[in-house]
Every structure is written in C-alpha cells, then in structure tokens.
A protein has these predicted regions:
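Generic detector of solvent-exposed, compositionally biased contiguous segments
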Residues: 26-48, 91-106
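Extracellular C-terminal loop/segment signatures of secreted glycoproteins
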Residues: 70-90
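Acidic, glycine-anchored loop motifs typical of Ca2+
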Residues: 46-56
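Terminal domain-start segments
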Residues: 1-44
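Beta-strand C-termini and the immediately following turn/loop, strongest in propeller blades
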Residues: 59-62
Length: 147
C-alpha cells in the first residue's frame, strides 16, 4: 500500500486489514492465482477516474468467517492527501482486480449497460457474485456480472 494511505486507512477503518492470499480458502486462492498470479487480492492500482492521479481499490475485512465483513473502497491521491470513497460493503472475503475501459452489460434485464471510458474495478465473491464499478465523469456506476 502506498505510503500515507496505510495510516489513513488504519485511522478511518480501525480493526480492518487488506484481504491477502492467506485470507482465502484453498479453492478461492487457486482461482485467484490462476488469473492474477501472486498479486494481492485486496489491493489493485487502477486509473479509475481517468485523471492519472495515484488511485487504488482496496478490500478491507474485519472479523472471522462466517461473520466476516468486507468493504470495497477506492482511494485517490489529490494534492498530497488521500480522498477515500466507500463503494460497497458485504459479507465474506471478496477480492478485487481491474479491467480495461469498455462495455459491461449487466446480468439482469433491468440493469443498464455501462460504457466505461476508464479502467473499471471488479469486486468478486468467488463462486457467488461479481460487480463492475465504473466512473462516468460524474458518479460511480455499477452492474452485476454474475450472481
């Protein structure tokens, strides 16, 4: 985690830690490593806002399964400080990665299609769900890719 962001996260989200490979069960660890090698499953650098400022997506967890809580946050460095936005909270031990700009169609008919001009954040609970988050220039949009 970048210097300065770690202390900001510790202050704002006490009692949490980044999801690591050690937090995943063997099956989920195998799935993650197959696609992402040995990268940290709870941290990814992503140009989410399209402004080239240092920006990271983090999955912070607290507690133990089956009562574990997870929160997806995006942190962007602006003028030397970190701007942190919470995108989602859920149960379990999800992972995060980035995908490129493009078209992302929602799983459900009522969901719109996102046309992401910048890289997107994928928040995934293996074997259960995956959600794509994109910045459209004004707000964060999300669609479910699987359920």
């Amino acid at each position: 985690m970048p210097q300065g962001l770690d202390s900001k996260v510790a202050t704002r989200f006490p009692g949490t830690h980044l999801v690591s490979l050690a937090d995943l069960d063997e099956y989920k660890k195998k799935l993650y490593k197959k696609d992402h090698a040995s990268r940290c499953p709870g941290l990814v650098k992503v140009d989410f806002y399209g402004d080239a400022k240092p920006t990271w997506a983090l999955v912070l967890i607290s507690g133990e399964n089956p009562k574990r809580k997870a929160e997806l946050v995006v942190a962007r460095q602006v003028d030397g400080d970190w701007e942190i936005r919470s995108l989602e909270t859920t149960d379990g031990t999800p992972v995060v990665w980035r995908e490129g700009p493009g078209k992302y169609e929602g799983l459900y008919e009522e969901e719109k299609t996102i046309h992401a001009p910048n890289p997107v954040i994928v928040f995934c609970g293996y074997g259960s769900w995956a959600i794509v988050y994109a910045w459209n220039g004004k707000e964060v949009e999300k669609v479910w890719l699987s359920d």
